[in-house]
């Protein structure tokens, strides 16, 4: 392939805590093997969909900026995603294949499962459509980034046109 878009992952934070070895296998080891295979081909670009919220940890100050985050993941899932970002940069540093990494947070859109552990937009919408009150954890002062799935598709395509970039 000329461009490889890698969006596959074991995406459950809960599973990553319950079975960190499984998470390591799916979110670090397999993508590294994929990159090694792609290096031996004529692939020119590797575009990776990482995870924003889980790799940066919780913000120290609200309202927040990028500098206000603790910078440390709080789950094996976040650790694997953060380390894979580092591996991509390291592995492709001296290769003919360039990369783009998109650290996406809380992607939402049509057909998203309202019964999963993540996807607060679909969970809240599903509850409201069923005349149920959404459950808010914490004190309600938490902050999160959200991005619509069509905007993610546009960002992935645009990122394939740039070399060796990290997008937050």
Residue ranges and their predicted role:
Residues 1-26:
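NAD(P)H-binding glycine-rich loop region in Rossmannoid oxidoreductase-like domains
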Residues 2, 44, 165:
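Short acidic/polar active-site loop segments enriched in Thr and Asp
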Residues 4-10, 46-52, 102-104:
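SDR active-site strand-loop-helix element
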Residues 11-15, 37-45:
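A short helix-coil junction within the Rossmann-fold of NAD(P)-dependent oxidoreductases
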Residues 18-33, 45, 54-101, 112-116:
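Catalytic helix-loop patch of NAD(P)-dependent Rossmann-fold dehydrogenases
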Residues 58-62, 86-145, 149-160:
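NAD(P)-dependent short-chain dehydrogenase/reductase
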Residues 161-168:
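Mid/C-terminal beta-alpha module of Rossmann-like enzyme folds, strongest
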């Amino acid at each position: 392939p000329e461009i490889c878009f890698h969006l596959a992952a074991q995406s459950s934070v809960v599973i990553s805590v319950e079975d960190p070895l499984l998470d390591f296998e799916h979110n670090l080891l397999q993508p590294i093997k994929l990159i090694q295979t792609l290096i031996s081909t004529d692939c020119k670009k590797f575009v990776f969909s990482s995870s924003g919220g889980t790799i940066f940890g919780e913000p120290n100050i609200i309202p927040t900026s990028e500098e206000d985050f603790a910078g440390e993941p709080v789950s094996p899932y976040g650790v694997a995603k953060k380390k894979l970002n580092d591996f991509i940069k390291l592995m492709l540093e001296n290769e003919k294949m360039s990369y783009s990494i998109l650290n996406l947070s809380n992607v939402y859109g049509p057909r998203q499962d309202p019964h999963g552990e993540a996807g607060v937009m679909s969970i809240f919408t599903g509850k409201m459509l069923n005349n149920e009150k959404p459950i808010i954890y914490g004190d309600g002062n938490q902050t999160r980034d959200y991005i619509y799935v069509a905007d993610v598709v546009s960002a992935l395509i645009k990122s394939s046109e740039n070399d060796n970039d990290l997008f937050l």
